[in-house]
Amino acid sequence: MAYRTNAVAAINVGFFEIAGSDDGRPGLTLMIDSKLFSLRKQLQSLLIIDQGNIQITKASAKILVVIGDKSVIPNQVHYFSNLKDITFYNDVWASTTLTSYTNKEILIDQNRSNFIVTAISKHGDNQIPQKGFILSFPQATSLPVVNINDSVKLILEFIDKDGKLINLSNTASIVTGIPLLVQNGKNVVDNPKQDDPAHARTALGVCNDGTIVIVVVEHIYKQHVKDLKLVQVRSILRQEKEINVDKLIIPEALKILEKHLVNYTVIGLTKTELADYMLTWI
């Protein structure tokens, strides 16, 4: 993504590969100019950019859709639907919801400055309105009693660790996924668990003058045997000079492969180690 957009800098925000897509989708919270891409409801560390101000804080999130006198709480945002969760989709997900045909869906679009119900569908995989969103209900969940043209209000709130509402404008951008490790020259590791296994880290530091320091620590790992492709297997086996590949049996091949591969061996830093390392940068 950074390469394609010719970005000056790029930050890992919890994206992961899905279905062979190089871009994938965000796994935690991502909102750009108040457009919601993904949402984690639990307490999390957030980087908030709003009207030129930068804030780093811990917060949880709440999402609620009010339709007439009914309230619907989506259990998840932009995930493939399952048998138990009501899912929220807007047009950043895809052209349609990609849900099961057995789902039921409420289509909501913008009417001037307000949202209204535009359709109630008895099947899934409906086209997502460009300025609206869809609530998708699994087969086992009943639809609330709503009507076409009912007014709709989308409520998205972020609450800080003290239970106070964070005031945001309609152009706010929020991302989570970067542990805050150093602030004002002090180690403020964002996790009470100090003995976490070593692995790669992307971290944030904030100086007294507002300067933000980003440190990316790369990691090294060796593949698991089950992740190997056939061409890789052949390449490794051919390195064994005294082996006849054509007559090799599976147990012997596995022993050779295991010599070359260590299950998820990782070289990196714990959060505490990275925090100490960052103190030398600030």
UniProtKB/Swiss-Prot annotation:
Q: Which Pfam families match?
A: NAGPA
- Name it: Uncharacterized protein RC0079
- Organism in which the protein naturally occurs: Rickettsia conorii (strain ATCC VR-613 / Malish 7)
